[in-house]
């Protein structure tokens, strides 16, 4: 009896100490990108979940970005093991099957609890079935892609009995979702709930606090942050005093086209007697100028009807035209020249397409490129030019360029897409003037025999830049477009090694009315970058770009070309496709050693093997034979952003902490 009493007292004392000491222990440590290094075990206290330092269970909230196929309350509820009715109610949805727009933030009510099986961490349990429909899934892809970092690969590995190489279709995995209950300190401060928010691109602590009607101080303290630095796609706990409601917010899209801001008219202070007088004077002057310009235009038109040829000499400041061309389009200069255009729709389209572009004289381009000399040749029919002291690239195209290509290039405004600045047509040859890329193409860096090499961080940033450009093409311009010709020679690098995609000659409108699928009999492109469904059946979808992007990523990882021809005995040749090689690298045994052998030798050991493995898995999914198994560009961008974020903090010594499980 005494022994039982003593045991009961011991248990009571332990519980009292646990609940008395834990709240004073501070709040919850921020994961800080450690969730990306699956094999690093030294951060288990952070990556496995939020510590049980409050009540054993509570009402909590998660956030989830709507993304097909999880874009209804019903589908999200099944994925996260929560109530569809509660999701519908809190997010003001008409029905549980109402489609939620892609990238819309969804608030998820969830029951959070602490149990002995969790290892002392708060979590909300979900179950995920490896169906095999999405290719080779891993703990990393399930936690960070499917569940959008609401779990971690470390937590899943610790609570599932299957090894990384044992994951096969049909298995059910426990997915511990990160949640937490308020500590005594937070409760005393008036906070009743904790919400797990996934940091979006461009988010700040103050912005998150404002979004959820919380405070920066509460978020900083609640996540044990020592600075304002938070990383994209990492979970942050947001203390709330009331239950959250629908949040109307979307991730920041690419910057809109830059529009010149009209000059602001100074406003006279109240009581100024001259303000209205000067307005009337200004209106009178404007009307007079408009009348004068109209008269001059009429005279100019009559003069042109009598003499259609251009004057033999032009003012120096207006030497932007090719005097020998038979087509001319008004420019942005002070004098506008008009030459007879044919009545064809293509000519009309070309005229409207380049009205906002600078129109160059052929003689000026000759001078700028040293008469298109070999010394100025960059590659093929592209020449380096110096125009008004600035470098430019002039692309020579035999024949007239299409108005659709010019129209597309003119409206593209993204930092990762090469910018068209000017234009010239002479005797059936078109000259396109682009911004200059000081560091050439990634093909020059990866496949040349020189000593120059790209660092790991440069490579992952290049991959992300290209994904940003494709995401812009597929999702942000109207109508959406497919590049259709992505390859390493068309990925250019500026002076800061930021990537810009070029060569839009075969770009095609993505017709959403045809369910993102088109057919063609004219298959064109470079071997090694063409998706099998395009080569075999002429199928065109946005996944065509995803496939080519995957090949480019494999080039960045390995330094190899998309296609390698091996000479064999008796004159035979063996063609090796990089998109096929990766399957043998990541399959079977000794993955770690095979991956090391696959990596570009010029990198040496200066890269994080775990992140290289994750990037290789991403590339492998992009080049999947089945187009439905390939991720969308948006999904690709999400994973790459996490890899880039983690690579920023990586140091070579970090790999000493990693285990050898990749070779298992």
UniProtKB/Swiss-Prot annotation:
Disulfide bond sites: 52-114, 58-181, 112-179
**Membrane topology qualifier:** Single-pass membrane protein
Location in the cell reads: Cell membrane
The UniProt transmembrane annotation reads 278-298
**Entry keywords, A to Z:** ATP-binding, Cell membrane, Disulfide bond, Glycoprotein, Membrane, Nucleotide-binding, Repeat, Signal, Transmembrane, Transmembrane helix
A matching Pfam family: LysM1_NFP_LYK
Protein's UniProt name: Protein LYK5
Instruction: Give residue ranges on the Cytoplasmic side.
Output: 299-664
Q: Which GO terms describe its molecular function?
A: ATP binding; chitin binding; protein homodimerization activity; protein kinase activity
Signal peptide positions on this chain:
1-26
Residues binding chitin, per UniProt: 135-141, 164-170
Give the function comment from the record. May recognize microbe-derived N-acetylglucosamine (NAG)-containing ligands.
**One GO biological process from the UniProt record?**
cellular response to chitin
Glycoprotein is among the record's keywords: yes
- Composition bias (Pro residues) maps to 251-269
Q: What does its record list under induction?
A: Moderately induced by chitin oligomers (e.g. chitohexaose (6-mer) and chitooctaose (8-mer)).
Q: Which residues lie on this side of the membrane: Extracellular?
A: 27-277
- Where does the UniProt entry place glycosylation sites? 45, 81, 111, 125, 129, 144, 213
Protein source organism: Arabidopsis thaliana
């Amino acid at each position: 009896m005494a022994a039982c009493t003593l045991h009961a007292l011991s248990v009571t004392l332990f519980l009292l100490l646990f609940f008395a000491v834990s709240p004073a222990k501070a709040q919850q440590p921020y994961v800080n990108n450690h969730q990306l290094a699956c094999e690093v075990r030294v951060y288990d206290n952070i990556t496995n979940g939020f510590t049980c330092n409050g009540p054993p269970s509570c009402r909590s909230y998660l956030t989830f970005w709507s993304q097909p196929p999880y874009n209804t309350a019903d589908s999200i509820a099944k994925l996260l093991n929560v109530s569809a009715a509660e999701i519908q109610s809190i997010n003001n949805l008409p029905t549980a099957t109402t489609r939620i727009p892609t990238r819309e933030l969804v608030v998820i009510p969830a029951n959070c609890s602490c149990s002995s099986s969790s290892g002392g961490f708060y979590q909300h349990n979900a179950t995920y079935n490896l169906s095999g429909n999405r290719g080779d899934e891993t703990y990393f892809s399930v936690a960070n892609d499917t569940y959008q970092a609401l779990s971690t690969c470390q937590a899943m590995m610790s609570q599932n009995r299957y090894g990384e190489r044992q994951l096969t279709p049909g298995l059910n995995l426990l997915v511990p979702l990160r949640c937490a209950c308020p500590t005594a300190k937070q409760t005393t401060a008036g906070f009743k709930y904790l919400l797990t928010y996934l940091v979006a691109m461009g988010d700040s602590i103050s912005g998150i606090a404002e979004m959820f009607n919380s405070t920066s101080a509460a978020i900083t303290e609640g996540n044990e942050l020592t600075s304002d630095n938070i990383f994209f796609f990492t979970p942050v706990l947001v203390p709330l005093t009331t239950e959250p409601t629908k949040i109307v917010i979307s991730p920041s899209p690419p910057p809109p086209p830059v529009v010149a801001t009209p000059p602001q008219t100074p406003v006279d202070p109240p009581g100024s007697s001259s303000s209205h007088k000067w307005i009337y004077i200004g209106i009178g002057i404007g009307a007079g100028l408009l009348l004068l310009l109209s008269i001059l235009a009429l005279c100019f038109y009559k003069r042109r009807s009598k003499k259609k040829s251009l004057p033999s000499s032009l003012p120096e400041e207006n030497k932007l035209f090719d005097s020998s061309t038979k087509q001319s389009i008004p420019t942005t200069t002070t004098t506008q020249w008009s030459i007879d255009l044919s009545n064809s729709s293509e000519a009309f389209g070309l005229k409207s397409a380049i009205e906002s572009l600078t129109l160059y004289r052929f003689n000026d381009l000759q001078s700028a490129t040293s008469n298109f000399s070999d010394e100025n040749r960059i590659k093929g029919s592209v020449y380096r030019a110096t125009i008004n002291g600035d470098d430019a690239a002039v692309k020579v195209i035999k024949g007239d360029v299409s108005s659709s290509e010019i129209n597309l290039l003119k409206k593209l405004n993204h930092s990762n897409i090469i910018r068209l600045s000017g234009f010239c047509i002479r005797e059936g040859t078109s000259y396109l003037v682009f911004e200059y890329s000081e560091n050439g193409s990634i093909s020059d860096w990866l496949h040349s025999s020189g000593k120059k090499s790209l660092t790991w961080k440069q490579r992952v940033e290049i991959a992300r830049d290209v994904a940003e450009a494709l995401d812009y093409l597929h999702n942000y311009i109207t109508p959406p477009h497919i590049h259709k010709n992505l390859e390493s020679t068309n990925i250019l690098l500026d002076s800061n090694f930021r990537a810009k995609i070029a060569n839009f000659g075969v770009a095609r409108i993505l017709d959403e009315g045809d369910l993102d699928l088109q057919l063609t009999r004219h298959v064109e492109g470079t071997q090694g970058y063409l998706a099998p469904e395009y080569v075999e059946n002429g199928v065109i979808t946005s996944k065509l770009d995803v496939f080519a992007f995957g090949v480019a990523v494999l080039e960045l990882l390995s330094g190899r070309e998309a296609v390698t021809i091996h000479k064999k005995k008796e004159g035979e040749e063996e063609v090796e496709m990089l998109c096929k090689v990766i399957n043998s690298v990541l399959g079977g045994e000794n993955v770690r050693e095979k991956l090391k052998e696959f990596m570009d030798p010029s990198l040496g050991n200066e890269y994080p093997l775990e992140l290289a493995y994750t990037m290789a898995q991403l590339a492998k999914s992009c080049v999947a034979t089945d187009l439905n198994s390939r991720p969308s560009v948006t999904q690709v961008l999400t994973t790459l952003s996490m890899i880039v974020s983690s690579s920023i903090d990586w140091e070579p010594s970090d790999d000493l902490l990693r285990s050898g499980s990749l070779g298992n």
